[in-house]
């Protein structure tokens, strides 16, 4: 029985150590599943998907997660700096957060100037 416990500890130790190395953004599935495309996490701008489609020709977005509730978003993503009463835009590549802004114009500018995510 003791040997079984030792074997279990030895087998589980690397797994437990590796989960500590995964960024919070990866655990929350904020990062893009597709290299070369971005995931957007938007707080406080419910109509951004329509704006992006109508106003731009940006096609480097894999997924958009839109949250209208500031309190809920702060609780779910405490590692992000969310400014209340303003739209918040967070851009993730396949590894981590690469850009954040409270300006829609700056978001569009960033996406146009950086068409290929890493």
Roles of regions detected by a PLM:
Residues 26-61:
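Local sequence-structure signature of Cys/Sec-based thiol-disulfide redox active-site neighborhoods
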């Amino acid at each position: 029985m003791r040997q079984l416990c030792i074997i279990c500890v030895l087998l589980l130790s690397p797994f437990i150590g590796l989960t500590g190395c995964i960024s919070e953004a990866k655990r929350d599935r904020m990062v893009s599943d597709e290299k070369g495309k971005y995931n957007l996490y938007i707080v406080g701008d419910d109509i951004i998907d329509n704006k992006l489609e109508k106003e731009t020709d940006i096609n480097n977005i894999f997924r958009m997660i839109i949250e209208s509730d500031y309190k809920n978003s702060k609780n779910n993503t405490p590692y992000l700096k969310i400014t209340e009463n303003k739209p918040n835009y967070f851009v993730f590549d396949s590894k981590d957060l690469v850009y954040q802004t409270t300006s829609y114009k700056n978001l569009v500018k960033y996406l146009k100037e950086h068409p290929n995510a890493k």
